[in-house]
Regions:
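N-terminal beta-loop-helix "entrance" segment that forms/cooperates
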Residues: 62-75
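A glycine-rich helix N-cap at a beta->alpha junction
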Residues: 73-110, 114, 118
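Short, Lys/Arg-enriched N-terminal segments with co-localized hydrophobic residues
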Residues: 1-9
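Short hydrophobic/aromatic patches at helix-to-coil boundaries
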Residues: 175-178
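A charged, amphipathic interaction segment
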Residues: 103-160, 164
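Short, glycine-rich nucleotide/cofactor-binding loops
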Residues: 26-36, 65-66, 113-114
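Histidine-anchored nucleotide/phosphate-binding helix
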Residues: 37-49, 55
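Short internal beta-strands
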Residues: 53-59, 137-140
Length: 178
């Protein structure tokens, strides 16, 4: 039985596929500045707490493994986006995203806010993940689809497909889709 009361259906304890309570897997599907933080914060925190962490980067999350990143944020589709300004919070309506240069401005504001508040950059968090032995897998299909080469990626990543992730996920206690 799982702690939630569910039943194991894939295997039993003796088959070698038992769920390890000290494991976490994360599917990383988004690569914008704001969406890059949750998987790296959760992954590095879990690793620091002694969990074995695997991150599977696919589709728009795959560029987070590139040696050179140029992360941006946009108000488009970010209805909850409010930037601290002049003692309050400035709402960034979706329509504003249609104005040329707004994404660049929003990205610069967000990067300044991150730096001002002493929050680690994505590059720093990614390096922490490497140092903490977080297993990072780039999706082979996505690499092929978007014409990425492994030499464009940071050192130490693996390349694998959905089956590689599923093998990890079926043994992980915590599975996140971000």
């Amino acid at each position: 039985n799982f702690p939630s009361g569910g039943q194991k259906t894939m295997s039993d304890e003796n088959s070698g596929n038992a769920i390890d309570p000290n494991t976490m897997s994360i599917i990383v599907t988004k690569g914008s500045l704001d969406w890059a933080y949750p998987p790296f914060i959760l992954g590095t925190t879990a690793a620091a707490m002694g969990l074995e962490v695997t991150m599977f980067f696919t589709f728009y999350g795959l560029p987070l493994l590139l040696k050179k990143m140029d992360l941006k944020v946009t108000p488009l589709g970010n209805a909850a986006m409010k930037m601290p300004m002049m003692g309050g919070h400035m709402v960034m309506p979706n329509i504003v995203a249609a104005i040329p240069g707004v994404d660049a401005m929003a990205s610069k504001m967000m990067k300044n806010l991150i730096k001002k508040n002493g929050v680690a950059s994505i590059e720093e968090l990614r390096e922490l993940a490497v140092e903490a032995d977080v297993r990072m897998i780039g999706c082979q299909m996505t690499m092929d689809l978007f014409d990425y080469q492994k030499d464009q990626m940071i050192d130490g990543i693996e390349v694998g497909g959905a089956a590689t992730y599923i093998e990890v996920a079926t043994k992980s206690h915590i599975n996140l889709f971000i």
